[in-house]
Amino acid sequence: MQPFRYHVFVCDQQKPEGAPSCGAGGGLAVIEALRREVAAQGLESQVQVTACGSLGLCESGPNAVVYPEGTWYSGLTLADAPELVEEHFRNGRPVARLQRRDVGEVCAEMAANRDKRLAAVRAREASGALPDDLNERIRAFRQSRVILTALELDLFSVIGEGGAAADIAARIHADPRATEMLLHALASLQLVAKRDGVFHNSPVAARYFTAGSPHNARPGLLHTASLWKTWSTLTECVRSGTCAIPQELGERSSDWTQAFIAAMHRNAAERAAPLVAAVGAQGVRRMLDVGGGSGAYSIAFAAANPELEAYILDLAAVVPLAQRHIEQAGVAGRVHTRIGDLRTDHLGEGYDLVLVSAICHMLDEKENAHLIGRCYGALAPGGRLTIQDFILDPDKCSPQSAALFSLNMLVGTRAGASYSEPEYTAWMHAAGFTAIRRVHMPGPAGLMIGTRAA
């Protein structure tokens, strides 16, 4: 393999609030600007720009080091990107005005920064102050709330190609002063940039948060915004043992349901190909997708096997949303929908594969045992049940994603939770399944697979 002509490492490490750092100085924005300029000049096969941790020159950042020659740069800005790419990366001439030439001075500055950092750590420990990482975890909700509020206001779409705070406030029907404060907070998170009083979306925000972008994640993230309200009841839920706002999916508003299904569709679309590869679609003629939501998994299985027919069972509020995705995928002749309640309605029979994805965490133990038993009855001999969910390890303390998601079910459902591998195994064994196994997958969810005896 041929290495890149230049490997450019740019620090974007964020230090505790108030401490000088490359992250606070705009390191991420510099990285994005360099990557854009490298692409614009057609040098992507010759230059690799990589984010890295501290280079030890925190008070002079953003800092970068360019290999193979080991050229150091400090105090970089967005405006420096075109010159760096043109002069250094294209023409091989380091930019003298930005270059750190005195090796002894650089080493002394690194040592001074290290000593200052260690002294600050010792002082904090002696004072009994919270460790920085713990303090940041406790306060992390502030960043989430800023982003979620911006998404609820569709602020990034309104910013578009750029706008002043007063104009943006008028378009979102909000207070000008408060809107400007929100924009400044977003700028501190490097999701927008402010230049000459005009706010612009960062490349990340433009890609994932704006209407018209093919990667727009806002519709699904509005479901995350709605979770803010339920998670705010966690203390009450822990005291009472159940959610404070009990509502089933069919009882929610249409806006909530659309946001929820949009979020589930985005997640499923990302996970569908790995799931199909892990389970296998060949030899499957009839598939049941229990609570299939948007239909993303059925669509993926149908695409992988032209002889497969899938049947999605879901609520009346969800089925029209699934039909829209099915029609867009061009598989309406082989992916069918049926309105029904997975808790009570007949599942059918003779299926080669039954998929239960993101369902078991909404149910209690008895409901899961009952559903898994009914899935066994719906399968043809030799057919397989695949459960995809947040699966806890036996001690229920890990993985972290499943442990936290269990609380999401506490605050959002009457009796849902994340369940452990031994619990799934026991339910499947009691139903009659054999060859039961857990399959670890990329991302937070895993699989439990069992076979009905031939």
Predicted segments with their positions:
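General structural feature for long, well-ordered alpha-helical segments within catalytic domains
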Residues: G26, V30, T77-D80, L84, ...
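Structural motif
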Residues: V66-P68, K194-R195
